[in-house]
Amino acid sequence: MKKFMNFFSSNEFLKMIMSTIYLPTPVNINYMWNFGSILGIFLMIQIISGFILSMHYCPNIDIAFWSITNIMKDMNSGWLFRLIHMNGASFYFLMMYIHISRNLFYCSYKLNNVWGIGIMILLMSMAAAFMGYVLPWGQMSYWGATVITNLLSAIPYIGDTIVLWIWGGFSINNATLNRFFSLHFILPLLILFMVILHLFALHLTGSSNPLGSNFNNYKISFHPYFSIKDLLGFYIILFIFMFINFQFPYHLGDPDNFKIANPMNTPTHIKPEWYFLFAYSILRAIPNKLGGVIGLVMSILILYIMIFYNNKMMNNKFNMLNKIYYWMFINNFILLTWLGKQLIEYPFTNINMLFTTTYFLYFFLNFYLSKLWDNLIWNSPLN
């Protein structure tokens, strides 16, 4: 036993792993801090299920749709792997949005490196999910890819050339499908690498907590206390996940994707998966094509502006103004998601413009509300 422990203490790689397991963690963190580890579980589920599906998938426009049918009908447990991978993407993004919203509420963006890497993971995940959505080669897959890739043509001077280069031709074709499959296969591995960097950056600074305090006296070992606590969260989320896979497997998808891609027949309403609807809604709210593309990209990149916040309050728990505004922002996000699947007609277009404006205003007005609250607290006669 002594030799075994000496081996652990002398091996640098194992020491690094053990330091991760026994990381000093604030004693008062709640279940909102569980979603990061749940995200790790879903990332591994996506990588493993995707690897198994890739053995039977054919990235060819003539047989891609039928290879999916073959996976569902003839491959042993293929239907289960496909449903897990398909609905796993929805759960992955749901957990990620909850994870980001918790960080916004508790001001975890003050851990600048952790926050910056996290936004990169979000962008890479969105790219991987978009390319994966094209692979089944259904109607919505084809037309979704056509619309989104065409947005690059809004870039002045070089836009059209970039679109042709991505397509590998004058329209979405076999070369496009092959490229998307290759990128969809490799991107999750790059995301996994970024997650490791994310964890390294987190372990350099330590986790935040609901009070925003940073006292080492109030920290305990992550294992076994919080590892056991995390397991309960895993069981609950995985139970809900498998329940949806077995009872409502196609509830989160689009019915148009059960039809094979037909370039001669445009769907009535082209829309992406539900987890991209908020960004798609912002894209549609701006009449100018280039402006819409900039709005789409900035809907994610604007999260980087949080790094420059220097409010004295370490979270919104005790900041009444910011707390109210935060929940207004969450409702705004949900309404943008709902508006993204509505038809482009009155009154949805007008409401869309309003909520797009308030979405971006949050990141600027929130800063001034924090400053106002800081001044009220720190300049109070009681201080």
Curated annotation (Swiss-Prot):
Binds 2 heme b groups non-covalently. The keyword Membrane applies. It is found in: Mitochondrion inner membrane. InterPro entries: Cyt_b/b6_C (IPR005798), Cyt_b/b6_C_sf (IPR036150), Cyt_b/b6_N (IPR005797), Cytb/b6-like_sf (IPR027387), Cytochrome_b (IPR030689), Cytochrome_b_C_euk/bac (IPR048260), Cytochrome_b_N_euk/bac (IPR048259), Di-haem_cyt_TM (IPR016174). GO terms for molecular function: metal ion binding; ubiquinol-cytochrome-c reductase activity. GO terms for biological process: mitochondrial electron transport, ubiquinol to cytochrome c. Heme b b562 binds at residues 85, 184. Heme b b566 binds at residues 99, 198. Heme 1 (or BL or b562) is low-potential and absorbs at about 562 nm, and heme 2 (or BH or b566) is high-potential and absorbs at about 566 nm. Component of the ubiquinol-cytochrome c reductase complex (complex III or cytochrome b-c1 complex) that is part of the mitochondrial respiratory chain. The b-c1 complex mediates electron transfer from ubiquinol to cytochrome c. Contributes to the generation of a proton gradient across the mitochondrial membrane that is then used for ATP synthesis. This is Cytochrome b. It comes from Apis mellifera ligustica (Common honeybee).
